[in-house]
Amino acid sequence: MKLLTTKITRTAITVVLVVLAFIAIFRAWSFYTESPWTRDARFSADVVAIAPDVAGLITSVDVHDNQLVKKDQVLFTIDQPRYQKALEEAEADVAYYQALANEKRREAGRRNQLGVQAMSREEIDQANNVLQTVLHQLAKAEATRDLAKLDLQRTVIRAPADGWVTNLNVYTGEFITRGSTAVALVKQNSFYVQAYMEETKLEGVRPGFRVEITPLGSNNVLHGTVDSVSAGVTNASSTRDAKGMATVDSNLEWVRLAQRVPVRIRLDKQPGNLYPAGTTATVVVTGERDRDRSQESAFNKLMHRLREFG
């Protein structure tokens, strides 16, 4: 009898443990698959690719890599003497055509005043036509002067906004061409998080929902708000061939990988450059309000920790 009781007790304990294990596994599985969260999230920021509008030798570089700069602060300067001479030449052309236009205006005025009684209509018309030609040349010279003045101004490259200089790859003495990217500027106070959520979790993601962000390798938890959800993503399994026909990749009907959709998250507080653009984080959407961690069960706390750092 005692042996039977022992067997029943052991069997009952085993059954209870198996049931508890199944419950724990089911809850963990539900927690991981149904709640809107992702480890595939990255800090992003507005980045300006700075390229000069003029070409020439770089005469000075006034900043260093990763420096925080203010709007309109000088970054580097390009060959000002050359463009100063071009401006002086353009101004000389303007002065020449102004003097010529004044002379032709006086001549045309005299001929118009004398009229056909003193000279032929052809001579009068010729004087007026010469005046119009000179005036057009003057307008062209003034436009060239204005462009030369603009080019001279643009030899000084300035920061378009407050931010951090990054990937600075220009040096004094180098020749830089027009339109070639010289440096990137990461705008200050423009950081946000781009989270790539699986399509199966988008039901729990809405603009205005609160979000927890845990940077990889950090114990800090940042908070933010869902700003927007992308309206579309590229279909990688369907392309076009050279004749425009659809090319669709073969797949297994019983294997379906969830597509990831970009979700833009607005941060409550800007972290500066503590978390550089491109670094990764774990994102958890908590719904219409922030999660009260003090009221969570030990199981949920454990799951959150595993989710954030697993």
UniProtKB/Swiss-Prot annotation:
<comment type="function">
    <text>Forms an efflux pump with AaeB.</text>
</comment>
<keyword id="KW-1003">Cell membrane</keyword>
<dbReference type="InterPro" id="IPR032317">
    <property type="entry name" value="CusB_D23"/>
</dbReference>
<dbReference type="InterPro" id="IPR050393">
    <property type="entry name" value="MFP_Efflux_Pump"/>
</dbReference>
<dbReference type="Pfam" id="PF16576">
    <property type="entry name" value="HlyD_D23"/>
</dbReference>
<keyword id="KW-0813">Transport</keyword>
<dbReference type="GO" id="GO:0022857">
    <property type="term" value="F:transmembrane transporter activity"/>
</dbReference>
<keyword id="KW-0472">Membrane</keyword>
<dbReference type="Pfam" id="PF00529">
    <property type="entry name" value="CusB_dom_1"/>
</dbReference>
<keyword id="KW-1133">Transmembrane helix</keyword>
<dbReference type="InterPro" id="IPR022871">
    <property type="entry name" value="PHBA_efflux_pump_AaeA"/>
</dbReference>
<feature type="transmembrane region" description="Helical">
    <location>
        <begin position="12"/>
        <end position="32"/>
    </location>
</feature>
<comment type="similarity">
    <text>Belongs to the membrane fusion protein (MFP) (TC 8.A.1) family.</text>
</comment>
<keyword id="KW-0812">Transmembrane</keyword>
<dbReference type="GO" id="GO:0005886">
    <property type="term" value="C:plasma membrane"/>
</dbReference>
<dbReference type="InterPro" id="IPR043602">
    <property type="entry name" value="CusB-like_dom_1"/>
</dbReference>
<dbReference type="InterPro" id="IPR006143">
    <property type="entry name" value="RND_pump_MFP"/>
</dbReference>
<keyword id="KW-0997">Cell inner membrane</keyword>
<protein>
    <recommendedName>
        <fullName>p-hydroxybenzoic acid efflux pump subunit AaeA</fullName>
    </recommendedName>
</protein>
